[in-house]
UniProtKB/Swiss-Prot annotation:
Keywords: Cytoplasm, DNA replication, DNA-directed DNA polymerase, Exonuclease, Hydrolase, Nuclease, Nucleotidyltransferase, Transferase. It catalyses: DNA(n) + a 2'-deoxyribonucleoside 5'-triphosphate = DNA(n+1) + diphosphate. GO terms for cellular component: cytoplasm. HAMAP family: DNApol_PolC. Its main location: cytoplasm. Belongs to the DNA polymerase type-C family. PolC subfamily. Required for replicative DNA synthesis. This DNA polymerase also exhibits 3' to 5' exonuclease activity. Gene3D superfamilies: 1.10.150.870, 3.30.1900.20, Metal-dependent hydrolases, Nucleic acid-binding proteins, PolC, middle finger domain, Ribonuclease H-like superfamily/Ribonuclease H. It is found in: Cytoplasm. This is DNA polymerase III PolC-type. It comes from Thermotoga maritima (strain ATCC 43589 / DSM 3109 / JCM 10099 / NBRC 100826 / MSB8). Its EC number is 2.7.7.7.
């Protein structure tokens, strides 16, 4: 911003003149106003094209105002006034009609306005009351409301937090003026953010529901922090400045206000029976917990959950409602498909097609509602004996002019109808043409209901005839994507016709019907009554779903709902998950079925003119009938007249009373408060929803608000009370409290699992440690076995043991993850190689056993070599000192989470093995729910900005983003998780099932619920795919060495974690002081930096580094500082969660408290004052206490030991079998291997590495390329080389060892890929290639591949074509 002071122009004296090009504003401050100022404003506006604000007020250019009025008003005075406020142009329009007209004109004149207005101008429309003379010109009168730009508040001193007190007039974020100093703004806090730096800043985000504002606290952060929180209503006072193009309040004082909440003050509360949450696929923004919290605040006794098409929120909803003391009602708003509708209706005789007379008809109408719209054209064709024998056609003059839209659709203009007969004259004549014929039409309900209703209106007759729908016939007899008349005609090859003219449509529909009659005869249908057989062949994907609410009444109903939901996703998913009406009828026990919104079957039929008897027949299917406030209108019904909707709801009420059905008023809730509507609009904006801005009032209403809406419809307080309070409560009383999940494990049953686990454990224990067992081993084994068996977890151990043994027997090692290495039983069963006993020696011959209690040794592998003092044999070294409590809790009752890393090549076989053990219908993939992440939510809001043309402030964008974040987007599956259903249960006892992401080609079913929600009820086996076991398998195949037999104390292997000496390379040329390139968990730049700083000398220190690198806020800003400051050594800092418990017990703390502190810290919850006090009493060092406070997540030691063990084995091969290591590495991890670059040598590799490392941000591919090139450089520096691919020698995928070199495989050639590479090997195995021509003929190689091969010498001296010689 440029600022000039003490300036003079003509007779105008300036205090200052500031130019802000980013905001497009010139700020002028003068001593006093004069006539010359107007000239100055015009001059500055002309020269700068910016808005000019004098002393905080924009002196708008009269010419500009006139141009805007001329451009937008035209000949009609829609705009009363044009006002500039900061960067906003406010157009004051005369009424709602004028607002709509000007909104339309703003879009069409955008280009001209952009040229007139300064950059960044936001245009707002404000409806004002038209003057009396304009009211006479039929400009609609708006609601009488005044929206003051500021309000006076009475502030109590005790609510003042600090600094300046509020000014007399207080603004809200949507009503503020830019550049007003000493401004007070009132709003609700929705976010607080603290930014640390040279200067600490506290950002407070305020909103009034219409707009939002960032308030910055600079010098008084400590006075504010902890005094205000999200949800508080405050008045912030300070300087309102324009920062980065938008207003920002620099806070100098804050006062807290009591929140003016909407509250339910009714003595008897209602029950909400229709509400959607963020689990309704990208449609609602209601948070489950906030929904329950609001219901509790309002005193609702019960609330329902009815998400679109799924029940995934049920577990979260139940937990929240239970805690709040509210009855949860589980349900769904289903996409119901009526597969039981008749093809022919009102059939009274059983004629054959040849005997019956049919009239095929089509109407053109002024709209879709027979109650209010009129027939303007009739076209009809009569069929007898399979032949067209007569036609009828007429245009009809309606009682009022037809709309432009109707003319566009039908091609019929008002002029064409002016001299035509009325419906009163036409109908008797047309009935004479019909006689006793059977009606035929395409989408026959529409035409039939129009005809029947107008016969009643005009002639007073209750008229009914049999009628056949060719649309329903098409869905039974044809397979099409669309069943429109056009599509059917095209499929049957009946030629072009003039659509949307009645006689043309009737003629072609007659041809369609006759063709269908022939098709029916071929399948044995010759009589009218036999047409009902066609119902069984109707394609469910062709049927249009309608909404239907289903509530769970009891446990049986919950299971039935789960079955219905499962089938809707697995059998009947088409665009949406569809529930067939026939299946709902079959599984209806324990369910209550509601009619849902106006898009439901009943509402739709009523709007389409169904008779009372038809509506009664439809209503009989439902247990209760829903009505909704008039401002809750389905998005595709926004043009629906409210008076018409009133009539429909009143009619449905009468029918329900006649049938003794409950009528309930529901809210169709999609967000909690009226001001949240903009959040849902932003959610819908990028989804192609044309009407996203015009949000219906889909918020949660109080009892009083709902009663007011019911009175608006029924104009009767008793009925209002009945539908709002009494009936919803009666339905809630009919529903039992159902617990969806018991929160106790239901393990699968394996006969004698307890006994097998005990026997296998003891057998192995005796084999290793002798019989009798050493006391420490005996006590540990007994403690673990008792916890495992008594809590029913033996079967989990047995499953894992069988899986590991199967993999090992097939030649693939298995790595353990998580805390399972804390269990000695798991080690003895072979589930994990991690031994959790203290570091110890054991003799494999005489079973001598010795525990080493020496703080220098944190791992048994680090113990000095020693011979058995009893028999002289070399002693084995083992043990890592890991307490069992970290795995199964202090009481041994925590569900054991056994995670196993299988080779990626073997994972699918492991999954199939589990299915064989328990049966395919008892094993399901663990389901996940993918939601909109914060970054994606920003994209939604930006799309909203683009489509509305409204530039949002950063604060308002934050508010909308927070609403959208967490909305369900799709589903998926855990990478290796399998959920096991016990043999005596069905999956529907726990969860519905579905395909991941609704992909029928996935080949697997997942749990419908996110696996975390059912983890306590079902056994979850994590059989993950991982590169490391594949790496180990390949190394074993290449060297013949069993990786499980390598020495875990090999000094040269250990040395590469602190230097490059064992590799024999120059660290400067390698650009690394340590030799861990390519070693899992230790090859990244971050961990290599840790290795350089710590220079580990033992296996135990490697474990600590692994823990430190995997934790959050454990190394940086924590352990690293304590080491550098000299407070602790690497061996003393907190690196894994077990360190806390072990250290505190060593200090004398009671073990259960030590365990609680460990659990708190590992989850990032810090420590309580009581914990801190006890730690100080035991003289725990202050740095240790502070370290506990900083940690956000801690890695389990067992997991670290497992990772380091795998890494150490791979490192052993790198040191002692280098070419085998590099062959395995590049084969398995070399996705970004570039043969062209690598074959150029080390200098080319170095150049590319410098380029990559200079990039500020690298994606996953670039990071992988860096890793691959680092290992390639290292290999070359160690004296090895790469050989180019060779058409006669290379493998498809594997790097092959040739002398001191690696032969590059075919799949590493750019653009070639596995499929082409494998085709080369197959062809080569059949017979050698004789020419390039032969190569291309017998493989998938193309010309581009050939050119690349030639450039790299892959083809050698292979001739271009076949060469034949006689001699």
């Amino acid at each position: 911003m440029k600022k000039i002071e003490n300036l003079k122009w003509k007779n105008v004296s300036f205090k200052s003149l500031e130019i802000d090009p980013d905001a497009g504003v010139v700020l002028v401050s003068v001593e006093k106003f004069s006539e010359e100022i107007e000239d100055l404003v015009r001059l500055l506006e002309k020269k700068t094209r910016f808005r000019v604000i004098v002393n905080g007020v924009q002196k708008s250019n009269g010419d500009l105002r006139g141009k805007i009025l001329s451009l937008l008003n035209g000949n009609v005075p829609y705009i009363k006034d044009v006002v500039f406020e900061g960067n906003r142009l406010i157009l004051k329009v005369l009424g709602d009609f004028a607002r709509d007209r000007i909104a339309s004109k703003l879009r069409s004149t955008k280009k001209q306005l952009d040229e007139l207005l300064p950059p960044g101008t936001e245009i707002m429309l404000e409806v004002v009351e038209p003057p009396e003379d304009l009211l006479k010109k039929e400009v609609p009168q708006p609601e009488k409301r005044e929206e003051p730009k500021g309000e006076e508040l009475k502030i109590e001193d005790e609510n003042h937090i600090f600094g300046q007190k509020p000014r007399k007039i207080v603004f809200t974020p949507s009503k503020i003026f830019e550049y007003n100093k000493k401004t007070s703004v009132k709003g609700k806090i929705f976010k607080i953010e603290k930014i640390e730096g040279k200067r600490t800043v506290l950002l407070i985000y305020l909103t009034d529901g219409e707009d939002s504002l960032i308030c910055k606290v600079f010098n008084d952060v400590e006075k504010v922090e902890g005094k205000v929180s999200v949800g508080d209503v405050i008045v912030a006072t300070g300087d309102l400045l324009l920062e980065n193009g938008e207003p920002t309040l620099y806070v100098k004082g804050i006062t807290k206000l009591p929140e003016a909440k909407r509250m339910d003050k009714s003595p008897v509360k209602r029950v909400e029976l229709h509400a959607h949450t963020k689990f309704s696929d990208q449609d609602a923004i209601t948070d489950v917990n906030e929904y329950v919290k609001r219901a509790k605040e309002w005193g609702f006794p019960a609330i329902a959950l009815t998400d679109h098409g799924n029940v995934q929120a049920i577990p979260y909803f139940y937990d929240a409602a239970k805690e709040a003391g509210i009855k949860p009602i589980f349900g769904i708003e289903a996409y119901l498909v009526s597969d039981v509708e008749p093809v022919i209706r009102n059939l009274s005789d059983d004629s054959t097609f040849g005997d019956a007379t049919f009239v095929v008809l089509d109407f053109e109408t002024t709209g879709l509602d027979p109650q209010v719209d009129e027939i303007i054209e009739i076209g009809a064709v009569k069929i007898q004996g399979g032949q067209i024998v007569d036609e009828y056609h007429t245009l009809i003059k309606p009682s009022r002019e037809i709309s432009r839209k109707s003319s566009e659709i039908t091609g019929i203009t008002q002029e064409m109808l002016e001299n035509k007969r009325s419906i009163e004259e036409v109908l008797p004549e047309f009935l004479g043409f019909l006689e006793d014929s059977i009606i035929v039409a395409h989408n026959a309900n529409f035409d039939y209901r129009f005809l029947r209703l107008w016969i009643k209106k005009v002639m007073g007759l209750d008229w009914e005839r049999p009628y056949i729908d060719t649309l329903a016939l098409a869905k039974s007899l044809l397979k099409l994507r669309s069943y429109s008349l056009d599509s059917v005609v095209e499929k049957l090859g009946l030629g072009p016709f003039r659509h949307h003219r009645a006689l043309d449509d009737a003629r072609v529909t007659a041809q369609v019907f006759l063709r269908f009659v022939e098709m029916m005869k071929k399948i044995g249908i010759t009589k009218l009554s036999e047409m009902e057989k066609l119902k069984d062949t109707i394609d469910y994907t062709a049927l249009k779903p309608f909404h239907c609410t289903i509530l769970v009444q009891n446990k049986k109903g919950l299971k039935n709902l789960y079955k219905l939901v499962s089938d809707s996703y697995i059998k009947y998913f088409y665009g949406v998950p569809r529930i067939l009406k026939s299946e709902l009828i079959e599984n209806r026990e324990g369910l209550l079925v509601g009619s849902a919104c106006i898009s439901g079957e009943l509402g739709r039929a009523a709007l389409e003119g169904a008779s009372d008897s038809e509506l009664e027949e439809i209503a009989k299917f439902y247990d209760y009938i829903e009505v909704m406030p008039l401002d809750v209108i389905a998005e595709d019904e926004e043009d629906l007249d409210r008076e018409r909707l009133k009539e429909v709801y009143r009619k449905l009420y009468r029918i329900a009373k006649k049938l003794n059905k409950f009528v309930v008023m529901t809210g169709d809730v999609h967000f909690l408060d009226p001001e949240d509507a903009r959040g849902r609009a932003a959610l819908l904006a990028p989804q192609g929803n044309r009407n996203f801005e015009n949000q219906p009032a889909l918020y949660l209403r109080t009892t009083e608000e709902m009663l007011e809406k019911a009175i608006e419809i029924f104009e009767d307080e008793e009925i209002a009370r009945e539908v709002v309070i009494e009936n919803p409560n009666r339905i809630a009383d009919m529903i039992e409290e159902v617990q969806p999940l018991e929160k106790k494990l239901h393990p699968p049953i394996i006969e004698n699992a307890d006994e097998i686990v005990r026997n296998l454990t003891m057998k192995r224990a005796y084999e290793i440690y002798g019989d009798p067992l050493p006391e420490i081993v005996q006590k540990r084994v007994e403690k673990e076995l008792n916890a495992i068996i008594n809590h029913g977890y033996a079967v989990l151990y047995l499953i894992a043991q069988e899986l590991v043994q199967k993999s090992m027997s097939d030649g693939y090692v298995v790595g353990s993850r998580g805390s399972v290495g804390s269990s000695l039983v798991a080690n003895l069963l072979g589930i994990t190689e991690v031994n959790p006993l203290p570091p110890h020696y054991r003799c494999p011959e005489c079973k001598y056993f010795e525990v080493v209690e020496d703080d220098r040794y944190g791992a048994g592998y680090d113990l000095p070599n020693k011979n058995c003092p009893r028999c002289g044999a070399p002693l084995r070294k083992d043990g890592h000192g890991i307490p069992f409590e970290t795995f199964m809790g202090f009481e041994g009752d925590k569900v054991p989470d056994i995670d196993l890393n299988f080779s990626g090549e073997y994972q699918e076989r492991a999954h199939r093995f589990v299915e064989e053990l328990f049966g395919k219908d008892h094993v399901y993939r663990a389901g996940t729910i993918n939601t909109i992440a914060e970054r994606s939510a920003v994209g939604y809001v930006r799309s909203y900005e683009e489509k509305t043309g409204k530039k949002l402030r950063k604060a308002e964008m934050e508010r909308l983003v927070s609403m959208i974040t967490g909305v369900k987007r799709t589903t998926g599956q855990h990478p290796g998780g399998l959920m096991i259903i016990p043999k005596d249960k069905e999956v529907y006892d726990f969860t519905p099932i579905q395909y991941p992401a609704n992909d029928r080609n996935a080949g697997v079913f997942t749990t419908h619920f996110a696996y975390e929600t059912i983890h306590d009820d079902l056994v979850k086996i994590d059989a993950l795919g991982h590169d490391d076991p594949t790496f180990i398998k390949m190394l074993k195949d290449l060297t013949g060495i069993d990786p499980m037999t390598i020495p875990m104390d090999d000094p040269d292997t250990l040395a590469i974690f602190s230097s490059v000496k064992p590799l024999g390379v120059d660290p400067v040329e390698l650009e690394s002081d340590v030799g861990t390139y390519g070693i899992p968990e230790f090859g990244t730049e971050f961990v290599r930096g840790m290795l350089v700083e710590t220079r580990p000398k033992s296996f135990a220190e490697l474990v600590r580094i692994s823990g430190l690198s995997h934790g959050t806020d454990v190394w940086l800003n924590n352990a690293r500082d304590w080491i550098n400051l000299g407070y602790a050594k690497l061996s003393e800092v907190i690196s894994c969660r077990d360190d806390i418990m072990n250290f505190l017990i060593h200090k004398g703390m009671e073990p259960s408290l030590a365990f609680k502190i460990m659990e708190n810290v590992r989850k990032g919850k810090g420590i309580t004052e009581e914990m801190e006090s006890e730690m100080r009493r035991l003289k725990v060092p202050e740095w240790f206490i502070e370290s506990c406070k900083r940690i956000k997540y801690l890695f389990p030691k067992a997991h670290a030991v497992a990772y380091v063990s795998m890494a150490f084995r791979i490192a052993y091969f790198k040191v002692h079998y280098p070419l085998q290591f590099y062959a395995a590495y590049f084969t398995i991890k070399g996705d970004q291997f570039d043969p062209v670059l690598v074959l150029r040598g080390k200098e080319a590799i170095k150049r590319r590495l410098r380029e990559l490392k200079a990039m500020p941000a690298k994606d996953a591919q670039k990071k992988n390329e860096v890793s691959v090139l680092e290992v390639a450089l290292e290999m070359i520096l160690r004296g090895f080389s790469f050989l180019p691919p060779d058409i006669f020698k290379s493998d498809a995928k594997k790097f092959l060892i040739e002398g001191n070199s690696l032969r590059i495989p075919f799949n590493k050639l750019p653009g070639l890929g596995d499929s082409v590479a494998e085709s080369i090997i197959r062809a080569r195995e059949e017979k050698p290639f004789t020419s390039v021509e032969d190569l291309m003929k017998r493989t998938k190689v193309n010309k581009n591949h050939i050119e690349l091969m030639k450039s790299l010498g892959v083809l050698g001296d292979l001739p271009e074509t076949e060469q034949f010689t006689l001699f």
